[in-house]
A protein has these predicted regions:
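N-terminal intrinsically disordered/low-complexity leader segments
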Residues: 1-33, 225-230
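Generic hydrophobic, amphipathic alpha-helix propensity
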Residues: 30, 34-43, 59-60, 80, ...
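Amphipathic, non-transmembrane alpha-helical scaffold segments
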Residues: 31, 39, 85, 89, ...
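Helix-turn-helix
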Residues: 37, 45-79, 83
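Short hydrophobic clusters on alpha-helical segments that form packing/core surfaces
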Residues: 38-46, 120, 217
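Hydrophobic alpha-helical connector segments
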Residues: 83, 97-126, 178-185, 210
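Short secondary-structure transition hinges
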Residues: 126-158, 203
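Hydrophobic/aromatic-rich alpha-helical bundle segments in the mid-to-C-terminal region
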Residues: 131-136, 145, 167-215, 224-230
């Protein structure tokens, strides 16, 4: 099996669920919106009750749908949880994509690193509950764990390429291995944010947290600000 079913309701099939064959795709505007409502409702239910205690019937009710209609869009609680995890992941890393990793940003400055860090930590703080659940579920759902590892690999690769660009322009320490540095900095940021926002083990203001992590990043790669264009 690719995953462990942690709650018997995940295999529950109500009388009005579609029988056999592939589930219907939400191709119409209404169908797309219904699917979005189910994902939004699932996120709320997971945050309120956790993964193990969340029920498909509660998700359907929160979304204003019948229990059976859920199965036109998702096969199980595990599947919709993965969809929620993907949406949270996109929100969490969008600041890095927009401010640092975009192809339009050739050389990130100190100010850009700080802004990306601020937005990233703000997203982490907002999504702390779901991120804690994703970490929990990834321990027994191999597909959720695979999603996490794939994102880590993708992000590490993109950050490494930024470091290489900086090294070629003599704006970062040329002795650093870009891949190892990117992986280490990513792990540092994620673990620090987890200790801070999920476990409450770090006591500092948001401003101080952003400033200190930014300084760590800049110092780690010996980042020099690009020369301003004339």
């Amino acid at each position: 099996m690719s995953r462990i079913r942690a709650n018997t309701e995940t295999s529950e099939t109500p009388a009005d669920a579609p029988e056999g064959g592939p589930k219907l795709s939400p191709r119409s505007t209404k169908g797309v919106r219904t699917r979005e409502r189910l994902v939004e409702a699932a996120k709320e239910i997971f945050e309120e009750h956790g993964f193990l205690n969340a029920r498909i019937s509660d998700i359907s009710e929160r979304a204003g749908q019948s229990h059976g209609s859920f199965y036109y869009y998702f096969d199980s609680k595990e599947e919709i949880f993965r969809e929620v995890a993907i949406s949270v992941d996109k929100a969490l890393f969008a600041p890095l994509d927009d401010v640092i990793l975009s192809d339009a940003v050739l050389l990130p400055s100190h100010a850009r690193v700080k802004e990306a860090m601020r937005r990233h930590l703000e997203s982490f703080r907002k999504e702390a509950r779901m991120l804690s659940l994703i970490e929990h579920v990834s321990r027994f759902d191999t597909e959720v764990n695979a999603l996490k590892l794939a994102r880590h690999k993708q992000l590490t690769s993109r950050v490494a390429e930024v470091i290489r660009r900086l090294q070629r322009r003599k704006l970062a320490d040329p002795k650093l291995d870009a891949e190892i540095t990117a992986a280490a900095l990513g792990a540092l940021t994620h673990r620090f944010a987890e200790l801070w926002f999920v476990q409450g083990a770090v006591d500092c203001t948001f401003k101080d947290g952003v400033e200190q992590l930014t300084r760590l990043f800049i110092n780690a790669v010996n980042l020099k600000d690009p020369e301003p264009k004339a």
